[in-house]
A protein has these predicted regions:
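Gram-negative outer-membrane beta-barrel transporters
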Residues: 4-174, 178-187, 406
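Primarily recognizes Gram-negative and organellar outer-membrane beta-barrels
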Residues: 6-25, 86, 114, 118-137, ...
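Hydrophobic, lipid-facing positions within transmembrane beta-strands of outer-membrane proteins
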Residues: 93-97, 156-162, 258-264, 351-357
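Extracytoplasmic gating/loop element in the C-terminal half of outer-membrane beta-barrel translocons
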Residues: 178-275, 280, 305-355
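Outer-membrane beta-barrel "beta-signal"
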Residues: 347-371, 375, 390, 394
């Protein structure tokens, strides 16, 4: 048996399950799942500003024979045994403001801002209790966790839309053009600044970093490490604004993503015999800005900074001086100089541009052909590097949609 999970006899399930959906967020009734604390007094601590507890065998003399050590980290006889209990730590709230306006006929404007805050002990970063416990980013170990920023919260989001309708009649039949532009802006993710290795010796690489306020609070292995570290700190807004503090889990935010989507919708009213029909043709470009610049409308990643793990714990000064020493972690042999830099590729369906065309009538709504799907299927692959690639793909979408839509209309009229 690799793990044992025990429930406290008084444990209760949350009264409400949490979810986020634009302006509606329901928070758990202060009842998140966490592990019970294993109390042990007399723990040694590091010297200096970062004075977290030390579990390492090589740094801590063990007078308590009830605690065993294996290798270089603390090891209890009840391996991987966790106890589930309730906690009252944590809270959450959402505030939203939406403004709608119609300054002139047929012009619709909308602007909305949503702020969400959520603090919790655990966002359940694992598939079972033991992996969840091991996945917590902490200072003094996973048994000592305070409420911290929710792993999946989006603190700030702005959405807006502009819509304009141009109606006209032709031979007594209504025609109309709808032009719509949609905007969404948000930070694409929350990250934690942690050390690259296990500093406190508890056997888990989840130690949150201490952000020194100046050179007096941190010791480096080399002068080059020191210079590279402070250069990195000054370019990162979170590190620069939280000097002298421990990094909070998931509190560092990725740069904002600004995305625009465009829709053109045409209304066609026509008669077949004595029956009047309405036909709509919609043309959508998702993430239209990405057609202009490949770096627009997509999120950045933190691969260039080793996923925000920039400091490596190198040990202490001596057996009698438990002052930690660090080095600056190198990515591909070079010191990182940016936190976020590598753009996600167009393989990410949620980020790249796509075009879709949809036909619908008052009897049938059918056909949605996406340019993005054609890329996956390899259509027009011989023209992919051609400047006409986009227009070929668009022509294919429109013609296929119209033909399929008209055929569907014919079948509906004939009763097939």
């Amino acid at each position: 048996m690799n793990a044992v999970t025990i429930n406290n006899i008084n444990i209760k399930n949350p009264d409400e399950w949490k979810y986020n959906k634009l302006t509606t967020v329901k928070g758990a009734d202060g009842k998140d799942v966490t592990t019970t604390e294993l109390l042990h007094t007399g723990m040694q601590r590091f010297n200096g500003a970062d004075n977290r507890m030390v579990y390492s065998y090589s740094l801590y003399d063990n007078p308590d024979k009830n605690v065993k050590y294996a290798g270089d980290f603390v090891h209890y006889n009840g391996k991987n045994a966790v106890v589930l209990d309730n906690t009252s730590k944590g809270y959450g709230y959402t505030a939203n403001i939406t403004v709608n306006a119609q300054p002139v006929d047929d012009l619709m404007l909308m602007l909305a801002y949503t702020h969400t805050e959520s603090k919790e002990v655990s966002g359940l970063p694992g598939s079972d209790p033991i992996s969840t416990w091991q996945g917590l980013n902490t200072i003094d170990g996973s048994n000592y966790v305070d409420a911290q920023r929710s792993q999946y919260v989006v603190p700030d989001k702005v959405i807006a839309s502009v819509g304009y309708y141009i109606p006209f009649r032709h031979k007594g039949l209504l025609r109309g053009t709808h032009l719509n532009l949609f905007y969404s802006g948000y930070s694409s993710g929350g990250y934690s600044f942690c050390y690259t290795n296990d500093m406190n010796g508890d056997g888990i690489n989840n130690d949150l970093m201490y952000i020194p306020k100046d050179d007096s609070e941190i010791n480096f292995k080399t002068e080059e490490d020191r210079v590279a570290f402070w250069k990195f700190v000054e370019q990162d807004s979170y590190l620069k604004n939280h000097k002298g503090q421990y990094a909070e889990a998931y509190a560092a935010r990725a740069p904002w993503v600004h995305r625009f989507d465009f829709r053109l919708l045409e209304d066609f009213e026509f008669k077949i015999g004595k029956t009047k029909h309405c036909f709509q043709l919609s043309f959508d470009i998702m993430n239209v800005g990405n057609l202009i610049n490949s770096k627009w409308g997509i999120s950045k990643t933190n691969t260039v900074s080793n996923s925000n793990r920039i400091l490596k714990y190198e040990g202490v000064k001596s057996a009698t001086d438990l002052t930690p020493v660090f080095s600056m972690y190198k990515v591909n042999g070079e010191y990182p100089t940016k936190t976020y830099d590598t753009y996600q590729t167009t393989a990410n369906a949620g980020s790249c541009k796509s075009v879709s065309v949809t036909c619908s009538t008052n009897r049938v709504q059918i056909t949605s052909v996406e340019w993005q799907n054609m890329i996956r299927q390899g259509l027009f692959r011989d023209f992919r590097d051609s400047p006409y690639y986009f227009w070929l793909s668009l022509l294919y979408c429109i013609s296929t949609s119209i033909i399929t839509g008209l055929w569907s209309l014919h079948k509906s009229r004939s009763g097939e």
